Structure formats: structure tokens, C-alpha cells
Amino acid sequence: DDLLLENNTFYKDVIDAYIRQPQDHTSIPYSDHTIPGLVYLSDYDLGTNDVAYYDQDVANYSLSTDQYEAWNKGWSYRNDGVDLQENSDATNSNGLHISFVEKDEWVNYTLDVQQSGFYNIDLRYATPQSGGQLKYLINGNDVSEQITLSNSGGWTYFTNHSTNNVYIQEGVQTFKIFVLGTTSFNMSSLNFSISNDPPPAMQAMGAITVSDERSVRLALNHPLNAQTIEVSDFEFLINGNTSNIESIQIDPTNSLVLVITLSDYLHYQDDLKINHAGGVINSVYNSLLGTLVNFPVQ
């Protein structure tokens, strides 16, 4: 009887883990996420830990420690490492939420964005304590500042936190929720809606090093006009010392990003900062990037 289809439940994540993931170390969508629209956070991409998501607890170590530890501590919906629990929230909910979040954990979602523009993002969350922290990234680049959550009244009392005027480009994009702090919270959905506000002032959102060990990606909140970026308008500091900048270019695949290439190689423990004079780099919304003083690079 166990072999009869009517006596079995289909779990697409289990099938994907057995058949695709051993040969294909990429992520694929779990569900279709059309933006503008609602994304249920339980429907993060399919893939292994550190590819589609990162969770601190992803395995059962009972054989080596003689102690059982669940990888999905919520015991619901999926067999991956992300902790999912059921809830009774009636707003923007499919009855599930991500729980037991810890610092540096993250989840990815493949979005099909119908039009470029500024979006308001409403996170549905619950927590009995203030101070939960997270940020949003698209294709590895920061698109939000640090987000700090307030006490919602309890683990089961869900409310919204709005992050407004986030620029998202049309097309298929990978959206990441990254947990920053040690204060835990539950999160169930994201609602993306087109902003009706005037464009915000242009600003730098974040900067990261890349794998060639000589380049840095500086993410902005506005797409840029085609223009020449003068090296002399920037200063790059490595451990407090000025480093020679070879070139600064707009990323040809993402006009929200400046690529800064250096003469010196970068090392893991280096303290990296960016200074910029301001008032010369123009966006498609005719907004100028302001002054940057000791802007940190991750």
C-alpha cells in the first residue's frame, strides 16, 4: 500500500535534492514570484545550503553524537535546513513562516520583475522583542540599509515593516534576505508594490569585494546615466593608506553598480574605506551622488 500514489505525498524539495542537486550545484525557483506581487518566504529557491539558503543547522548528527537534532526545527512544509513553522495569520500569509533565524543566515528568491522602478517592500514579521536586524540584496548587491524590527507583541502577532523606494530592475533577479543581528524573529512574506513617491536622493547602499581580489562593487540606489567616472573623484583607503585606483566603471550588466579596480591586492582582514567628493555622478533621475566619507567595504 505504501507504493500507491494516493498514499504518498509529493515534496518537490525532496525530489530535487535526490535527482538534481547531486549533479547541479545551482539554485532554481521553488515557485513563480511575479513582481509587483506577494512572495511567501517559505517558497525560497531550491538548492543546497549555501547556494539557495544558509542555515546554521542543516543536518542530523545523531549518528556521531548520539543526539538527535532537527535540521528544519519547525517540522513543516519542506525537508531543507530552513526552519519553517505554521501560523494562523490571515494577512499576506500562506500559513507558514521562517522561524529560529540566527545571525548570518539568509534565503534567496528568484523574482520575475515586470517593470523597472522604485518599489515599496512590506515584510510580514512577528517577534516579542525589539532589535531584530536584516537587509535586502539583489544579485549580491545591497539594495537596503540595515533594517531594525520592533516588538510586534509576540511570536504569533504578525505585523508589517515597510522599506520604501527600493530600485529593482526589470527581468529575472535574485533577491536575498540576510539576517544581521542576534535578536531572533519570525518572517512570513514580502509584498512588493510600485512606489508612488518621488524618487529618493541618490546614495550608496553598500560595497563588497569580488573574487579577483582587486575590485570592489559599490552599489547605488539609482541607475546611472552613461558617463565617464573620473578616478580623481574617489579615494580608496586600505588600512588607512591611500591605494591607487586603476579604473572606475559602471557595471555593463547593472547600471546600479560602480566597479572600482585597484592596483593593490586586497586581503581578508584589510580595513577598506571609500571617499568620494560628491556632486558629479548623475543618475537617470537627474540626482547626484553625495559625498562619501570613510564608506565601509565588506
Ranges and model annotations:
Residues E213-Q249, K273-G279:
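Short, surface-exposed alpha-helix to beta-strand junction/turn motifs within ectodomains of secreted
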